[in-house]
A protein has these predicted regions:
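Classic N-terminal secretory signal peptides
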Residues: 1-25
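Glycine-centered tight beta-turn/hairpin loop motif at sheet-sheet or coil-to-beta transitions
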Residues: 73-75
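Short, solvent-exposed mixed-charge patches
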Residues: 94-95
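A short, surface-exposed beta-strand/turn
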Residues: 78-90
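Short, non-transmembrane alpha-helical segments in secretory-pathway proteins
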Residues: 32-55
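Conserved histidines in hydrophobic membrane contexts and catalytic metal-binding motifs
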Residues: 48, 68-69, 87
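Surface-exposed aromatic
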Residues: 61-69
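Acidic/histidine-rich, surface-exposed loop or edge segments in extracytoplasmic proteins
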Residues: 26-32
Length: 95
């Protein structure tokens, strides 16, 4: 019986360490507003184009964000998260 208890104790120590990397891959929190307050996807796509992003390969809802994969006006790869209410950039990764 001791081995089972010791095994469960070890699991309690290891489990949080295994789950921590999952949180690292989660996207940012862009808004807490309800979706009926969000800009339409068409309006956001227009704003993204006005900001100079082009060749958008992916435009999607990601958690509480609009997320794009495309290119900057300087032709650099971009992954960008936007606040869907204001259109502001919340997080960007430019290569």
């Amino acid at each position: 019986m001791r081995r089972i208890v010791a095994g469960l104790g070890a699991l309690a120590v290891i489990a949080p360490a295994l789950l921590a990397p999952v949180a690292a891959f989660a996207g940012p929190t862009c808004t807490t507003e309800a979706k009926d307050k969000w800009m339409s996807q068409d309006a956001m796509k227009a704003k993204v184009a006005e900001m100079g992003y082009q060749k958008i390969k992916t435009f999607k809802v990601s958690g509480s964000c609009y997320e794009i994969y495309g290119y900057t006006k300087d032709n650099k790869k971009a992954e960008v998260y936007f606040n869907p209410v204001t259109g502001a950039v919340v997080k960007s990764e430019i290569d």
